[in-house]
């Protein structure tokens, strides 16, 4: 069955395509597979504070990836109107990481990164901070100036430039600091009915796990949900996510949703995670790189439908081209947009027939016209290659030593010296 994915949302005066099981899947599904006479939702809508998200699916914040352009593309595939919750969204799409210092200083690039499309609801922003006072000030800006409807806090980043300052996945080790930051942002969010969530990892390494204690602390401070990437900082993106940690967190945290993250490469992976852990929803990161239609699959799967997207190469090329156009609108700079799209090209073309010479040329593309010329050389009829186009994508790497501030692991509380260091260690730039 071949359709088109060039217009993920049907026009207002048109009727959406209807799959053979009666599921409205819009015009975004391309070639789709699977049908059945009945649909039974796997999970109820996801409730995050006042927001009701139709499908329990969240786009993970990814530095340098989840800008307004990419969120728009994912939203077109995930939100075709079917199953949207009370907040008008079928999935939740979170911004890339925004550092609180850069926001408080109103850094020009940061202020651009927190902008949303008018139709983007709820407006979701992830904040990174290592200082409660700066975190509070940043949250106050977002709430008092009506710039966000949901705030997520980053306690999961494993990169050295973050952990060496005591931030990201290193921070929950300091119990008092973690609670102070979470509590400050929750308090500011409450002033505007803006719910706050946290995203974290299992811990620093296997000997320094923090997720259960941190999850309970966040729950006590009043967060609206807790998300767990089921790897340690030392694992980074290597190895296999330990979904049993998600199950244990779900058993411990009982008053707010628990979301699972890690190794969701397909809708079937998401369903399996829910079945094995009992989590209330899933957070999808690397699995959607070059596959924004994964959100169509996920929405269908959680609605009880077996419809899946299997686009031909021409449809994939059109999605890539549209992504580049959205980046051009976002940056207001075609050359910069083309430099950005380069990193996505291998993900889009994964498993498809495209020679090394063409791939090399695409990796150097510097204009939309050049991109069009190169994409025109692809065989648009080449079918979806199945397993070769699916599975793991994005960075993986190997386990590594976690770089931490001196003496960080000696005590669970901040020393006066560490408190002074942390207060001056806020990152001054947002994103990737």
Predicted segments — roles?
Residues 1-53, 57, 63, 210-225, ...:
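Alpha/beta catalytic cores of nucleotide-metabolism and tRNA/nucleoside-modifying enzymes
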Residues 37-47, 62-145:
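Glycine-rich, positively charged N-terminal anion/phosphate-binding segment
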């Amino acid at each position: 069955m071949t359709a088109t994915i060039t217009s993920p949302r049907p026009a207002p005066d048109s009727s959406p395509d209807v799959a053979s099981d009666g599921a409205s899947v819009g015009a975004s599904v391309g070639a789709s597979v699977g049908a059945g006479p009945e649909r039974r939702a796997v999970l109820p809508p996801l409730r995050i504070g006042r927001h009701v998200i139709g499908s329990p699916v969240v786009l993970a914040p990814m530095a340098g990836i989840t800008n307004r352009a990419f969120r728009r593309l994912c939203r077109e595939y995930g939100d075709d109107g079917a199953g949207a919750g009370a907040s008008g969204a079928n999935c939740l799409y979170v911004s890339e990481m925004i550092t609180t210092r850069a926001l408080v200083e109103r850094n020009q690039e940061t202020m651009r990164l927190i902008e949303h499309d008018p139709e983007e609801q709820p407006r979701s922003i992830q904040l990174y901070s290592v200082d409660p006072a700066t975190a509070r000030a940043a949250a106050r800006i977002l709430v008092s100036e009506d710039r966000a409807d949901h705030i997520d806090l980053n306690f999961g980043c494993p990169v050295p430039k973050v952990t060496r300052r005591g931030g990201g996945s290193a921070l929950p080790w300091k119990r008092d600091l973690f609670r102070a930051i979470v509590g400050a942002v929750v308090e500011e969010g409450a002033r505007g009915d803006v719910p706050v969530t946290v995203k974290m990892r299992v811990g620093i390494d296997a000997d320094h796990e923090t997720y259960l204690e941190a999850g309970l602390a966040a729950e006590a401070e009043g967060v609206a949900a807790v998300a767990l990437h089921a790897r340690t900082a030392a694992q980074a993106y290597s190895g296999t996510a330990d979904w049993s940690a998600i199950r244990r967190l779900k058993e411990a945290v009982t008053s707010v949703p628990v979301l699972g993250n890690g190794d969701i490469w397909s809708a079937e992976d998401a369903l399996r995670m829910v079945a094995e852990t009992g989590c209330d929803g899933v957070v999808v990161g690397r699995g959607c790189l070059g596959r924004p239609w994964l959100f169509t699959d996920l929405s269908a799967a959680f609605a009880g439908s077996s419809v899946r997207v299997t686009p031909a190469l021409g449809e994939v090329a059109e999605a890539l081209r549209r992504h580049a156009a959205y980046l051009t609108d976002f940056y207001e700079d075609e050359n910069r947009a083309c430099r950005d799209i380069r990193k996505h090209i291998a993900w889009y073309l994964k498993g498809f027939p495209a020679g090394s010479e063409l791939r090399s040329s695409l990796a150097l593309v510097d204009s939309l016209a050049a991109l069009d010329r190169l994409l025109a050389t692809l065989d648009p009829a080449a079918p979806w290659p199945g397993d070769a186009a699916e599975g793991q994508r994005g960075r993986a790497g190997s386990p590594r030593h976690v770089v931490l501030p001196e003496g960080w692991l000696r005590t669970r509380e901040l020393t006066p010296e560490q408190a002074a260091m942390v207060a001056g260690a806020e990152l001054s730039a947002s994103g990737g």
